[in-house]
Amino acid sequence: MSTVLYRCPELLIGGEWRPGRHEQRLVVRNPATGEPLDELRLASADDLQLALQTTQQAFEHWRQVPAHERCARLERGVARLRENTERIAHLLTLEQGKTLAEARMECAMAADLIKWYAEEARRVYGRVIPARLPNSRMEVFKFPVGPVAAFSPWNFPLVLSARKLGGAIAAGCSIVLKAAEETPASVAAMVDCLNQELPPGVVQLLYGVPAEVSQALIASPVVRKVTFTGSVPVGRHLAELSARHLKRITLELGGHAPVIVCGDADIARTVNLMVQHKFRNAGQACLAPTRFFVDRRIYGDFVDAFGAATQALRVGAGMAAETQMGPVASARRQAAVQDLIARSVAAGARPVASAVPEAGYFVAPTLLADVPLDAPVMSEEPFGPVACAVPFDSLDQAIAQANHNPYGLAGYLFTDSAKAILAVSERLEVGSLAVNGMGVSVPEAPFGGVKDSGYGSESGTEGMEAFLDTKFMHYVA
């Protein structure tokens, strides 16, 4: 049991924590038990307008702060975040359900992301272009795009908020973050660490009715940049809103990651890595390996090993030290995943699963073997502890089947064949590819998708560029 007292946070507006004034409130629940933790007060229309007003004022000051000072302030915020890791991790496990070990890891990853962006603030360079005229100079400048409206989800609330906070603040922008109402306390604790080192209004945190918040922020002339991580349908809607108001937007949307396992792969190592990666956070990850295309020559051995490892996972409350996989985040997610499994089994898939606790929002970690290509699980993102496996007879067939899907976020390949690596790296339609490993998301490299998985990148220099505008100057003496 956690000794951390859980309380839903207030809103952070203008450097001050204040209660939301919306008439509607939301109950935050512990996914491991289904019991209520606290009641969250939401932002009213007046709260949203106040946040917009103060973010504009803060931007006018923050954009002029030297990059070295922005870096130093963010690094002090990161130090506070690391000092508070244990408390924040407990809050995250209570409200989201993931294991405490995973929550600690997420807090560390969020700190690494913000630290990288802080350092990158000192490396925002322009360039000098050789002049066409005598006594003249042509230069290119980079400058902050302006106030940012950011929307982050509940599955990795710290990391996916940190990607937005770190880049925007380091670039010299102010930011209004609408974080997920399901996981408010952990994000608020992280934001508070940054806020204590920043001028009032540079970072603001809201919780509210999603449609009301997105409409108010994106339609406002104050906001100059939008960034969103979440589902494809919501991403489409926000893209339409942003287009209507000519706002730049970065979208990191769903994923249904293919894994191509060639005949020369080390089965034991592949299964060990992929079971860890697949069932992390109960499979609620857009980059989770989900569709396994396995060389027919090793398919039987692979399915047996993966199924055995899946059944051996210890499922339970995230606070228990022995737990390897916690619950899914909500009753709605539990019902959706169970429905997808049932429809896919009805279509011919063979399930391999284990028992789970009856209380709380638990779904058994499940391998669906011998899955027909037209089964629902092959096209619908599970966003839960479900993996599916099908055999292939040629690499061309595997690549074609992997690409036969609207998503294109992450992909995985296991082989020692240089020819296979070259073919898959060129032809697999994904934004990130890991070969013989799991590393598709690190602070210093761009992360983003293709097709229905969105556009634009977070992290890496590309992620920093998303918060910058470009100006050309031609000066004649």
From Swiss-Prot:
Keywords: Aromatic hydrocarbons catabolism, NAD, Oxidoreductase, Plasmid. The active site is at residues 252, 286. Its EC number is 1.1.1.257. It is an enzyme of class 1 (oxidoreductase). CDD domains: ALDH_F5_SSADH_GabD. It catalyses: 4-(hydroxymethyl)benzenesulfonate + NAD(+) = 4-formylbenzenesulfonate + NADH + H(+). NAD(+) binds at residues 154-155, 178-181, 230-231, 253, 381. SUPFAM superfamilies: ALDH-like (SSF53720). The keyword Membrane does not apply. GO terms for molecular function: 4-(hydroxymethyl)benzenesulfonate dehydrogenase activity; succinate-semialdehyde dehydrogenase (NAD+) activity. GO terms for biological process: gamma-aminobutyric acid catabolic process. Involved in the toluene-4-sulfonate degradation pathway. Does not discriminate between the sulfonate and the carboxyl substituents and can also be involved in the p-toluenecarboxylate degradation pathway. Homodimer. Belongs to the aldehyde dehydrogenase family. This is Putative 4-(hydroxymethyl)benzenesulfonate dehydrogenase TsaD2.
